């Protein structure tokens, strides 16, 4: 689950008539819930027969560092990194 849990996320905030994507840290409870949510969500999209097989394959992929849930986490981190210049706007 540690390979899936996000450290940062971006939140939209309207400042001066413009929306900014502001990176912020994720609380530990939210990290865990997002990680589990993504794990189940991407396991459901897999092509194996039963949900047990889908979930097992997604967990194995996440442990090895690939899989859709890990890609989602990397995408979120990339977005936060790209918008790092707006970090001084507090949430």
Curated annotation (Swiss-Prot):
Record keywords, A-Z: Ribonucleoprotein, Ribosomal protein, RNA-binding, rRNA-binding, tRNA-binding
GO cellular component: small ribosomal subunit
Keyword flag Nucleus: no
A GO molecular function held by the record: tRNA binding
Superkingdom of the source species: Bacteria
Pfam families: Ribosomal_S7
SUPFAM superfamilies, A to Z: Ribosomal protein S7
One biological process term in Gene Ontology: translation
Annotated function: One of the primary rRNA binding proteins, it binds directly to 16S rRNA where it nucleates assembly of the head domain of the 30S subunit. Is located at the subunit interface close to the decoding center, probably blocks exit of the E-site tRNA.
Family note: Belongs to the universal ribosomal protein uS7 family.
Subunit description: Part of the 30S ribosomal subunit. Contacts proteins S9 and S11.
Protein name: Small ribosomal subunit protein uS7
Organism: Apple proliferation phytoplasma
Gene name of the record: rpsG
């Amino acid at each position: 689950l540690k390979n899936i849990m996000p450290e940062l996320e971006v939140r939209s905030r309207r400042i001066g008539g413009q929306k900014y994507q502001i990176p912020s840290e994720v609380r530990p409870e939210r990290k865990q819930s997002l990680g589990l949510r993504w794990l189940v969500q991407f396991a459901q999209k897999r092509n194996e027969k039963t949900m047990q097989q889908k979930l097992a394959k997604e967990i194995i992929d996440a442990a090895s560092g690939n899989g859709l849930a890990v890609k989602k986490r990397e995408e979120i981190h990339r977005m936060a990194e790209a918008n790092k210049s707006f970090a001084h706007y507090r949430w």
